[in-house]
């Protein structure tokens, strides 16, 4: 089965972060932060992170087209998300830009062991969870790195529906046959 990992850098030291990546044999980190910087944790700024990863023998790619910080559309069908940031990202997932980004990610992940990375440690509080839904529906096993020994398999969002081959997150009772 095709496998892809997710990880959040959180407040870890760069050494702790690299240790997690090595424990799961990650060969490439795909940064899915819209803005690849961190004021609170400067070790995860794009330049510093890329340098540390390169020194550890791990490739780095920034994929802004999979980044979060999206705003919901006025005609959003993803009303199941009360969190407007998640609703906005769910709306964005139906765009050609997202689909292209997802394909680029999949192309990388068939060649190397890849982890998508954002800042939030808890994947269910990050847009990585929605990206993981899209990948899981495409037949990928997505594992969320928690510790050196633990990577939790992704479970699809409970209110996810597939309508006309698109992932949607309708409010309860919407789009029911």
Regions found by a protein language model. Give the residues of each.
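Residues lining hydrophobic/aromatic ligand-binding pockets adjacent to catalytic sites
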Residues: 1-177
């Amino acid at each position: 089965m095709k496998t892809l990992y997710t990880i959040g850098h959180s407040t870890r030291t760069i050494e702790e972060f690299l240790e997690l990546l090595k424990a799961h044999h990650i060969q490439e980190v795909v940064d899915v932060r819209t803005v690849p910087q961190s004021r609170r944790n400067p070790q995860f700024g794009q330049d510093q992170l890329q340098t540390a990863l390169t020194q550890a023998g791990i490739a780095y790619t920034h994929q802004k087209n999979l980044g979060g910080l999206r705003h919901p559309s006025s005609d959003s069908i993803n009303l199941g998300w009360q969190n407007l940031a998640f609703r906005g990202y769910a709306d964005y997932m139906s765009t050609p830009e997202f689909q292209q980004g997802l394909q680029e990610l999949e192309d990388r992940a068939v060649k190397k062991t890849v982890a998508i990375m954002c800042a939030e440690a808890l994947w269910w509080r990050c847009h990585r969870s929605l990206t993981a839904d899209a990948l899981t529906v495409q037949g990928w096993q997505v594992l969320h790195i928690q510790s050196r020994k633990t990577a939790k398999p992704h479970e699809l969002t409970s209110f996810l529906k597939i309508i006309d081959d698109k992932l949607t997150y309708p409010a309860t009772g919407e789009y029911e046959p």
